[in-house]
């Protein structure tokens, strides 16, 4: 599938520390096996690091065979490193490719000189060549990079799997009722597609016929199958369960959920965090450090031993053993793995800095409705306070105004009125009163739906005892006003989510204080907070109040994470150190929010914190390994322990260098969410 291939390609390109590297990763496997054919005769016909074995695979003119094969190997097998080094120098960011290119170039050029001295010069004595080292160096480098690229690819494997979820074709239901198999790219918005049991749903859409259960585990991380009926949304890439359904297409191509997720993740992987910028800088300095140590070691050994072969071997070993690459990949590989795992589990990381900031969070502020509670209200009590209006008339007036709103409280009232067969009308001039409720005209009379705060602020009389009784039972209470008089009320209960209590306990165990922010009344807020174990509660808030509360907490030096609705809580999410938009569903492109939680599950807040902790731990491990390896390996390669007989050959240096990067990649791949 084209999309999948493009995503896979982008994943590699994002590691721009090794641009020369990325251009050639597809060739490493082929180049390794072709180079092996050239390298075997070179290795057999060359003295092993200057040591003559009891048996020799040589014949008259064999040195010419070695020269010709080494030249082919240098330009063919060494091409990724030579052109990669050239790219790095062109961008003024010399790194690992440049070091390897320098190492094999020095080995090859000096070997040409040795060949000339041994075959055409009248000078006595044998000049040692480096053709054996050159062949083994190039082979080991190609093998190491092939293994590494597999590991790098696996780091973003979850994302690649997501890209492969969409099928290549779909069954389109034509206007005449005929079915026709068409390519996914030919599907348009508003087309009807048919999906049989067990098939992958080709696009985002709405079920227009049939009912089924859907497996969304690979798309949103939702482990249980989700029951879907007519008018329910489905996500492209999820698996249809038991029934055949017809789906009206709502989004295709880049507008689809999966494409948006992969786009956001790719963007996050390409953005550099402060830790990554630092490691890039250190990796850049490492090139100059390695070249300097290599040149100094060459000069020092020439002065000590006056042996150009040994001194040159030290120089080449230093150049090939230094690995800025291990340092350069330390963070991007963990990031690729982390963001992919997150996306696979319905946690979209938009801002990578938030993963680092999450280690220092002091407070998590949460909206009550929909975050801590289900947001599925049930009407528990409704009452008229006016003798000439029945209770059902009050319900009808509430439902008329609320029919124009998509707030959970409004939807609950309208559904309840329908279930009671209470009719209601379409109101005129309905306006939202921010943080309070609604107002509008019904039969040319103005009605307002408000909360208790509004009544208190404006001096309205109401039954306070009834309010306290219902509120302490956990009800949200709305009042209906006509002609400056409270004429009725409605009380709605909400259920606390099962996972909320565990989430609060987990936060407290991490020394993070949970804070409830809600527009609901004090009594309801404290009743819910008490049940959950939250002691810090702010109730009866206007939308702008939440932002100022976050600002107050931050002014004392605290780091604040805000969890809320990506649209209604946008200012608060932007103000917080980390903004988490919860329950985004397929609308993952919400502008506000550093992290987007597809589901409305509070336990995903803990999953994000766990993923952040695990990610940072892997980053630190990789940085220590990347830096520590170079601190130890470069002086060893220079011959600092030669006096006790510990000398590393260029081939051993190349093996260690390749291993160092592979270890970083494997460590990144072991990152888990749990």
Curated annotation (Swiss-Prot):
Belongs to the cation transport ATPase (P-type) (TC 3.A.3) family. Type IB subfamily. It comes from Staphylococcus epidermidis (strain ATCC 35984 / DSM 28319 / BCRC 17069 / CCUG 31568 / BM 3577 / RP62A). One of its GO terms (molecular function) is copper ion binding. It is an enzyme of class 7 (translocase). InterPro entries: ATPase_P-typ_cyto_dom_N (IPR023299), ATPase_P-typ_P_site (IPR018303), ATPase_P-typ_TM_dom_sf (IPR023298), ATPase_P-typ_transduc_dom_A_sf (IPR008250), HAD-like_sf (IPR036412), HAD_sf (IPR023214), P-typ_ATPase_IB (IPR027256), P_typ_ATPase (IPR001757). Involved in copper transport. The keyword Phosphoprotein applies. PANTHER family: ATP7, ISOFORM B (PTHR43520), P-TYPE CU(+) TRANSPORTER (PTHR43520:SF8). Mg(2+) binds at residues 565, 569. The keyword S-adenosyl-L-methionine does not apply. The chain crosses the membrane at residues 32-52, 57-77, 95-115, 127-147, 284-304, 315-335, 623-645, 649-671. This is Probable copper-transporting P-type ATPase B. One of its GO terms (biological process) is copper ion homeostasis. Pfam families: E1-E2_ATPase, Hydrolase. GO terms for cellular component: plasma membrane.
């Amino acid at each position: 599938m084209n999309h999948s291939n493009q995503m896979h390609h982008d994943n590699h390109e994002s590691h721009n520390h090794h641009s020369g590297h990325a251009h050639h990763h597809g060739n490493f496997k082929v180049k390794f096996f072709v180079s092996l054919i050239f390298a075997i005769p070179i290795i057999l016909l060359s003295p092993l690091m200057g040591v003559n074995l009891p048996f020799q695979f040589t014949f008259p003119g064999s040195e010419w065979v070695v020269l010709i094969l080494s030249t082919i190997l240098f330009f063919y097998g060494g091409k990724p490193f030579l052109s990669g080094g050239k790219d790095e120098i062109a961008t003024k960011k010399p790194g690992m490719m440049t070091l390897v290119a320098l190492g094999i170039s020095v080995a090859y050029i000096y070997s040409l000189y040795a060949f000339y001295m041994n075959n055409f010069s009248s000078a006595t004595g044998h000049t040692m060549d480096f053709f054996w080292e050159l062949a083994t160096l190039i082979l080991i480098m190609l093998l190491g990079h092939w293994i590494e690229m597999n590991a790098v690819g696996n780091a973003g494997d979850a994302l690649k799997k997501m890209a492969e979820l969409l099928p290549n074709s779909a069954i389109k239901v034509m206007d005449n009722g005929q079915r026709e198999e068409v390519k996914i790219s030919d599907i348009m918005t508003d087309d009807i597609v048919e999906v049989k049991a067990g098939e992958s749903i080709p696009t985002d859409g709405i079920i227009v016929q049939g009912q089924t259960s859907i497996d969304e585990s690979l798309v949103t991380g939702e482990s249980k199958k989700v029951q879907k009926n007519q008018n329910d949304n489905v996500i492209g890439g999820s698996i249809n369960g038991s029934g055949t359904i017809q789906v009206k297409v709502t989004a295709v191509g880049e507008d689809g959920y999966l494409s948006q997720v992969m786009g956001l993740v790719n963007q996050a992987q390409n953005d550099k965090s402060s830790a990554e910028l630092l490691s890039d800088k250190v990796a850049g300095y490492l090139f100059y450090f390695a070249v300097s140590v290599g040149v100094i070691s060459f000069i020092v050994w020439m002065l000590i031993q006056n042996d150009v072969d040994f001194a040159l071997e030290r120089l080449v070993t230093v150049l090939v053993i230094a690995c800025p690459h291990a340092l350069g990949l330390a963070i991007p590989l963990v990031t690729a793995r982390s963001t992919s795992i997150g996306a696979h589990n319905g946690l979209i990381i938009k801002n990578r800095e938030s993963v680092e900031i999450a280690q220092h969070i002091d407070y998590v502020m949460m909206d009550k409705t929909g975050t801590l509670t289900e947001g599925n209200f049930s009407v528990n009590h409704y009452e008229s306070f006016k003798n000439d209006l029945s209770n059902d008339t009050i319900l009808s007036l509430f439902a008329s105004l609320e029919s124009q709103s998509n707030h959970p409280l409004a939807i609950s009232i309208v559904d309840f009125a329908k279930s009671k067969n209470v009719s209601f009308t379409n109101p005129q001039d309905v306006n939202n009163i921010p943080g309070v409720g609604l107002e509008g005209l019904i039969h040319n009379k103005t009605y307002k739906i408000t909360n208790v705060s509004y009544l208190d602020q404006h001096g309205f009389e109401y039954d306070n005892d009834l309010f306290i009784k219902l509120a302490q039972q956990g009800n949200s209470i709305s009042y209906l006003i006509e002609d400056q008089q409270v004429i009725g009320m409605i009380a709605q209960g909400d259920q606390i989510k099962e996972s909320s209590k565990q989430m609060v306990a987990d936060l407290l165990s991490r020394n993070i204080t949970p804070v409830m922010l809600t527009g609901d009344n004090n009594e309801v807020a404290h009743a819910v907070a008490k049940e959950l174990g939250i002691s810090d509660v702010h109730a009866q808030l206007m939308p702008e109040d939440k932002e100022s509360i976050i600002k107050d907490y931050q002014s004392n030096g605290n780091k604040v994470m805000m969890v809320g609705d990506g649209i209604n809580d946008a200012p608060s999410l932007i103000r917080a150190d980390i903004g988490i938009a919860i329950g985004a569903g397929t609308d993952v492109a919400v502008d506000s929010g550093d992290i987007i939680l597809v589901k409305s599950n509070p336990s995903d807040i803990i999953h994000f914190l766990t993923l952040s902790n695990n990610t940072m731990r892997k980053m630190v491990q990789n940085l220590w390994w990347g830096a520590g390896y170079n601190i130890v390996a470069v002086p060893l390669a220079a011959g600092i322990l030669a006096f006790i007989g510990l000398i590393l050959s260029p081939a051993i240096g190349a093996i260690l260098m390749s291993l160092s990067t592979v270890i970083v990649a494997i460590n990144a791949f072991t990152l888990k969410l749990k």
